[in-house]
Structure formats: C-alpha cells, structure tokens
Design a protein with these regions (language model features):
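Beta-strand-rich N-terminal accessory domains
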Residues: 23-124, 128-195, 203-206, 215, ...
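Catalytic cores of secreted or luminal carbohydrate-active enzymes
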Residues: 215-254
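Solvent-exposed, conformationally flexible loop/turn segments
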Residues: 227-228, 265-270, 298
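Extracellular ectodomain segments of secreted/surface proteins
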Residues: 241-280
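An acidic-aromatic substrate-binding cleft motif
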Residues: 256, 260-272, 324-384
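Extended acidic/polar, glycine-enriched regions
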Residues: 279-339
C-alpha cells in the first residue's frame, strides 16, 4: 500500500509543478504589444476592454502620431549626444510577463512587464552602462501617450480620458479619468526611481492645437552611471473607480500623496501642506524653497505656515536615502490687484477697436514676446 501511495505521489508531483508554473493572477490591466518594437499599442482595463487608454501610434488616429511614440519607447542624451530606443535586440514574452532589450549607444535598456498578486501591471525600465567610461544620462523621456484628445463629443464621452500628471519626484503618479465622468480610471504610481517632469510632443497649431493635448512623455531624473552600473525606473499600473479610491490604492501600495489645502494664496494667508502614507515610521525633513523648516514624522505629516511674501513656494519632503517629493504653491500680493491688473492689460492690449471692421470690440490674441497682437505679427512676418 505504501509503495502504491509513493507511486501516486511521484506521478502527481510533475502535474503539481506544471500547475504551479502555469498559475496566473487575475489581471486588472491588459495590453497589446507591437511585435516589431516590443512597445505597447494598447492598454485596457479588464473590466472594460472597449476603451484604449493610449493613442494609436500607427498614424490612423492622428497622422503625425506614428510608431516613434509607442508606449515604452523614448529618447535620452548620453554625454550630450541624443539617442533613442525603438528597435529591440532581444524580446521574450509569455502569458505572464514580457521582457524587451534595447541598445542605444553604450546604454542597454531592459524593459520588463509583469502582473503582481493583485493583478496590477508592473513595468520597469533598467538603464545599464555597457561602455568603458562614465555615462551621463540627461533628458530621459519615456513615451506614455495617454489618450487625452478631443475629436468629437461622442468619442470623447465613450473613449477618451483626462490625464492628470503629478511629477512629484520619487512619489510621482498619473491618474487618468474618463471624460464622461463614469467610474473606472487608469492609475500609474512610482515604485522605484523618480519622475522630475513631463513633456508634451506634437502639439503645434497645425496638429489640432487645443483639440489635441499631445503625446506625453515622462521624464525620469538625470543620472550618471559608471561602467556596469544600472539605473531603474519602475511603476505600477492599476485601475480605480475615482480619485478617492486611486489615492487609497496608491497609499496602500507605498506611495506618499503630497497635497495642499490651497495652491494659490494671498501674501499674509496661511497654507497647509500634507504628506500621507502607509508608513507610521516615516521620518524626514521639510524644506521650504530649499531651506529646512521642520523635522517631521508619521504616516500623516502636516505643516502649516503663513506666507508673507509673494512668489513660488516649494514644500519638499526629504526622507529615506536621498528620496524626496514636493508640493508647489504660489503666493500673490493681492487677488483684487492681480485681477485689476489683468483686466487693464486685456482692455489695453487685447481688445480690437476699429469702427466699421466686423472684428471691432472682439478680444484677440496678444503676443507678449513681440508686444503686438498676433494678427499684426503675422502681417509683419510676411513682409520680411
């Protein structure tokens, strides 16, 4: 009997290992990848696959948005010379994960995509210096072409989003809401590395101007790599029904949410900033425009101060091993005087007055660089 049981166990073991190897977590986010570039051409919520949250990059949605702008491709400067990555040297994908390798100059870029236990998509970009000298990486830009544009009312209502980007350093995030206001949005939160800003490409007037918000690219912090050294940017893509749920999920996944009760105040008024996390043991220093103002700790850090002088006010939480995130606010001398000054400028520079002209009384665009109305600047340029 014991021998029979052993035989049964030995026979069952390979089947169990196969089952473990093939098991997969539920997927809240799914994607389509381009077979040639390894970049993403589609990004979807599993709960509603009818909406693609990123631009079609084959020229069919906008003729100027082509394969250069596919999700996950990008460009950077290496020791002052600009490079881009778009053709993989190696690619491997299964139903559980995907890896793509690129080489540009002396920098190897390894892109990995996989699902975590919660069914959220983890995406990482590893930059490796394969050269024999230090590599100064600057102006890094990773394509994240969120589908934020305005073709027509029905399309906007059913299949477009508003992308809200918080370039908050190590605690950066993006939350895309449906233009219809319906529940269900796409979130992106940083897990490793930092995002210092973002770019918007392909948005000149001839490309739709205000109806096309452009192609978004996230900008990681600059980095100098010694030979063999690597630098990783990693973020998590998840779904959330609304802003409250997104922030709750972001905090639960380790993000620090920075905010202020007001982002524009008059000089002499108080402002409250907060940094919420799921880490009660968090300790750090709070800086105001680079100057330390307080030592802080806890999972709900708050700071209140009176702003006495107008200008930009940057509240920075510095913590951990060189990590930081910031809240930027603006103080003005007086709202009434600001509005009055603006109204005087509009009346004096932007109202077209010419009796008999059908445009008389209309408000026009004023070019502050040349200090003349836009239509006059165009006439002047045509005479050059």
């Amino acid at each position: 009997m014991k021998n029979i049981m052993k035989l049964f166990l030995y026979a069952a073991l390979p089947l169990a290992l196969i089952a473990l190897g093939s098991c997969s977590y539920p997927k809240n986010i799914t994607f389509k990848a381009d077979s040639q570039t390894g970049a993403l051409s589609g990004l979807y919520l599993t709960s509603d696959t009818s909406m693609n949250w990123i631009l079609r990059t084959d020229g069919t949605q906008y003729e100027w948005v082509d394969s250069r702008y596919r999700w996950g491709l990008g460009h950077l400067r290496i020791n002052g010379t600009e490079y881009s990555w778009n053709i993989p040297t190696k690619k491997h994908d299964t139903s559980h994960h995907m890896t793509v390798k690129y080489q540009t100059g002396d920098i190897e870029i390894n892109v990995a995509r996989k699902w975590n236990r919660d069914g959220n998509l983890v995406e990482s970009y590893e930059f490796v210096n394969t050269g024999e000298k230090d590599a100064d990486l600057q102006d890094i830009a990773i394509n994240t072409p969120f589908n934020d544009n305005y073709p027509d009312a029905r399309t906007c209502y059913e299949a477009r989003c508003n992308a809200h980007i918080w370039a908050g350093g190590n605690e950066a995030y993006v939350y895309c809401t449906r233009m219809s206001g319906a529940p269900g949005g796409l979130g992106l939160i940083m897990e490793e590395g930092a995002i210092k800003g973002y770019e918007v490409r392909e948005r000149p007037q001839k490309n739709g101007s205000s109806n096309f918000r452009g192609v978004f690219q996230l900008n990681p912090q600059d980095k100098t790599l010694k030979p063999g050294e690597c630098y990783t940017i990693q973020w998590l893509l998840l779904s959330a029904d609304n802003w409250d749920e997104f922030q709750a999920k972001a905090i639960d996944n380790g993000l620090i949410i920075a905010s202020a009760d007001r982002y524009v105040v008059e000089a002499g008024e108080k402002i409250n900033v907060s940094f919420k996390s799921n880490c009660p043991s968090l300790k750090g220093k709070l800086l105001l425009n680079g100057k330390e103002v307080a030592e802080v700790s806890g999972d709900n850090i708050t700071y209140t101060t009176t702003i006495n002088e107008p200008g930009e006010k940057i509240f920075t939480l510095a913590y951990g091993n060189g990590k930081q995130t910031s809240v930027e606010c603006l103080a003005v001398s007086n709202f009434d005087s600001l509005v009055n000054h603006r109204c005087q400028f509009i009346a004096g520079h932007q109202q077209f007055i010419k009796p008999g002209d059908p445009r008389s009384g209309a408000f026009i665009v004023y070019d502050k660089r040349y200090r003349i109305p836009l239509h006059q600047r165009r006439k002047w340029q045509q005479t050059l």
